């Protein structure tokens, strides 16, 4: 492989929502050189690639940031970092205003005020939200973007980050990137579990299939402390299209009903996990399928829904048109997705302080990869990108010298990369191992197949089988650098799977139905587990760390 060494002040891994905004923030507030590495292309990468039709985190009139903290805390049944939620919430409106100035169309009423959707949301025309961010980044001073570069590991020495390693998916260049500070913004993890739709349509999922948990995996391997991986996220979505349901529930007030026409959502509770659990239970007890009731809405609401889904999930609009019946003439069937690990909706991710500093010195995290702060959505990811960006600048300014990446470290990672670029032909492919991994997680770690439920014996089997699959990855081969990326993605997912299993096993209670439904411990246990379940990889094994909650008014700082 051809090799190239690059030096920069701040390396941002991931050019999605948080990554782009971190770059903009650094550019506008310092003269630091910024390098964004994105394995796709920042114009259409990350969770915003297809667009969105609402900003789900905004402090509307007569509300305050603490109200949003309280909402997120209630939805997660207390397992949140209130200090992180508050520092995020205080920036939500500021970053929204900035987005509008960059060109995002936010709908307004006749008085010029934002059109709200519920207590925390704004309606937008957001199909082009990611190109808007990408264009701003391309115009920013001192910011360079390397598209189609896959970063696969950090360079960490004595718990301090010195940069990262990657390769060009199209160029085939092996990159050693030295940086004074690194911001990880690679999103969450999809593809761990078997998805709703099989075969050719398996990509039809709620979370981007290209978000493979790379940031989580690199942090886990480097010994960073992680938090709350047991709080998986399962999205309640329109059946088959896996289109969002919030547009229906909040946009036209559609209630969850069973096949008998009974409204069941209030029977189980209205938190995110309870809405999924209720749907699963109604189906199990023979009252399915379940729907969002749209029959009888107005023609104007019909038109509004058709347009809204074009901004985010056009397949749902196409499905209505293809059937010849608008939503006013047919209820929308719903189902739960496979579980994901995503710190923008639940609290899974890096254990960080209020500066979004991880437990590895010089490494900061923002967006879905950062833990403790659920219900971020778009604006929360922007807010965390800003916080991480400013913190990285402050960190660099506080240091007098920075260590270089050693030749030994570079040569080791180069050898580990090149070993897959051979002409050997094993008995199995990367895709086959990925499908095997998803089958294991689906069957033994609480996937769709088991209605998201698991017991400790199943988790033990899952852990054993995932470790077996991990050993098989050493024999894989890649004909080109695209296939090499697929191998990296598989290894990332397997690393994350092991942490998910360890966390599910460690929380010996059921606090969130469906999200973490432990059949051996079916009740909530506030006495023992009204706490964070954290973990750190030590000597090749996952060590569980139980930490007390950081509650209102407290501020956590890394100390041990």
Regions found by a protein language model. Name each.
Residues 5-8, 171-181, 359:
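Core beta-strand elements of the Rossmann-like FAD/NAD(P) dinucleotide-binding domain
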Residues 10-36:
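N-terminal Rossmann-like FAD-binding beta1-loop-alpha1 element of flavoenzymes
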Residues 28-50:
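Glycine-rich FAD pyrophosphate-binding loop
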Residues 40, 181, 185-190, 369:
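Glycine-/small-residue-rich beta->alpha transition segments that form the dinucleotide
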Residues 56-88:
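Glycine-rich active-site loop/strand segments that organize a redox cofactor
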Residues 93, 100-152, 160, 228-377, ...:
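Mobile, glycine/GP-rich and aromatic-enriched active-site lid/loop segments adjacent to catalytic centers
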Residues 184-243, 378-391:
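Glycine-rich loop(s) and the adjacent beta-strand/alpha-helix scaffold that form part
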Residues 397-479:
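Long, amphipathic alpha-helical stalk/connector segments used for oligomerization, subunit docking
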């Amino acid at each position: 492989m051809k090799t190239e060494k690059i030096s920069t002040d701040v390396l941002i891994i991931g050019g999605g929502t948080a990554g782009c905004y971190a770059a903009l923030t650094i550019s506008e507030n310092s003269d630091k050189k910024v390098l964004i590495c994105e394995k796709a292309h920042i114009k259409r990468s990350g969770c915003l690639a297809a667009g969105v039709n609402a900003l789900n985190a905004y402090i509307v009139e007569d509300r305050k940031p603490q109200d949003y903290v309280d909402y997120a805390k209630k939805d997660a049944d207390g397992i949140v970092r209130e200090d992180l939620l508050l520092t995020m919430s205080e920036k939500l409106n500021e970053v929204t205003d900035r987005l509008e100035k960059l060109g995002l169309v936010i709908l307004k009423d006749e008085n010029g005020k934002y059109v709200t959707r519920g207590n925390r949301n704004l309606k937008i025309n957001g199909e082009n939200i990611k190109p808007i961010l990408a264009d701003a980044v391309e115009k920013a001073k001192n910011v360079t973007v390397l598209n189609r570069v896959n970063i696969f590991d950090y360079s960490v020495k004595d718990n301090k980050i010195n940069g990262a390693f990657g390769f060009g998916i199209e160029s085939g260049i092996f990159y050693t990137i030295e940086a004074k500070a690194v911001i990880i913004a690679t999103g969450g993890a999809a593809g761990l579990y078997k998805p709703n739709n099989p075969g050719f349509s398996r990509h039809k999922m709620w979370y981007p299939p290209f978000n493979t948990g790379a940031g989580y995996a690199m942090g886990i391997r480097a010994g960073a402390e992680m938090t709350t991986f047991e709080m998986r996220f399962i999205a309640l979505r329109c059946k088959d299209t896996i289109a969002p349901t919030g547009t229906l529930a909040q946009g036209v007030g559609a209630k969850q009903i069973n096949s008998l026409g009974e409204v069941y959502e209030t029977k189980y509770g209205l938190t995110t996990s309870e809405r999924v659990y209720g749907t699963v239970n109604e189906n199990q007890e023979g009252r399915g399928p379940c729907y969002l009731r749209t029959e009888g809405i107005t023609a104007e609401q019909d038109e509004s829904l058709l347009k809204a889904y074009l901004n985010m999930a056009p397949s749902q609009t196409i499905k209505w048109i293809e059937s010849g019946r608008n939503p006013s003439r047919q209820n929308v069937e719903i189902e739960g997705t496979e579980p994901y690990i995503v710190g923008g909706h639940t609290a899974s991710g890096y254990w960080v302080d209020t500066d979004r500093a991880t437990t590895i010195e010089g490494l900061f995290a923002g967006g879905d990869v950062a833990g403790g702060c659920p219900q971020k959505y778009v604006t929360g990811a922007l807010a965390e990108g800003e916080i991480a960006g400013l913190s990285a600048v402050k960190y660099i300014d506080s240091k007098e010298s920075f260590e270089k990446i050693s030749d030994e470290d570079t040569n080791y990672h180069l050898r580990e990369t090149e070993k897959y670029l051979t002409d050997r032909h094993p008995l199995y492919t990367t895709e086959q191992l990925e499908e095997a991994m998803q089958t294991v997680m689906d069957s033994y770690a609480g996937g769709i197949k088991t209605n998201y439920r698991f017991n400790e014996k199943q988790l033990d089997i899952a852990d054993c089988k995932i470790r077996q699959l991990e050993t098989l990855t050493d024999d894989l081969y890649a004909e080109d650098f695209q296939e090499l990326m697929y191998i990296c993605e598989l290894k990332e997912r397997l690393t994350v799977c092991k942490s998910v299993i360890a966390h599910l096993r460690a929380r010996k209670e059921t606090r969130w139905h469906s999200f973490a439904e432990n059949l051996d411990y079916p009740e909530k246990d506030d006495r023992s587990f009204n706490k964070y379940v954290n973990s750190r990889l030590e000597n090749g094994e996952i060590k569980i760390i139980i930490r007390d909650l950081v509650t209102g008014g407290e501020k956590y700082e890394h100390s041990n």
